[in-house]
Amino acid sequence: LYTRAAKHYTGRATVPVLWDMKQNVMVNNESADILRMFNSAFRDLSPATIDLYPTQLAEEIDEMAHWLYNSLNNGVYKAGFASSQIAYNEAVKDVFLALDKLEIRLSDGRPFLMGTHLTEADIRLFVTLIRFDVAYHGLFKTNLKRIADYPAIQTYMEQLLNIPEIAKTVNLDHIKAGYYSIKALNPSGIIPKGPLEIEQLVKAAKKNAA
């Protein structure tokens, strides 16, 4: 797609990509932008009741998104690709401080980060949570705890996973194959079989979503 968009492109090819199939052009390759575009530019294609970026919560969502990215979404990568023990130690500390704070926030039983309304903040968090025990915990060495060791976060993740539209997007085999194919971190290319708990959860959620 990158060379179709620009014949002589020689840079990195990253995902996700939003591609215009009619114009044969790349619209955007930044996940945060694409997420917000789905909520605005494609409003006519989604139910009117869904608004992942409501005006009254916009400032709070922006603050949460900024914090999530720096401490957790990107934090796991800082740990996984750290080139020194000091950098790794700092990154891992930040990751688990963030998870500890999220555990406290979600311990009041709220279904979503902002309370009773599903927002883009939940989507941003979910994509890291669903990958954590499967890939980040082992491959990125963020192994102080698993998501399964955080009762409130685990319950929150399961609630999101039980939303059919979300469950249908999860493919643990693809997640594991993608991450464990990173030669710098896993030279053998061996893909682990587990963990069984999350596989069973995803299997049940996808069955209910069918």
Task: Provide a role label for each language-model segment.
Residues 1-210:
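C-terminal alpha-helical interaction module
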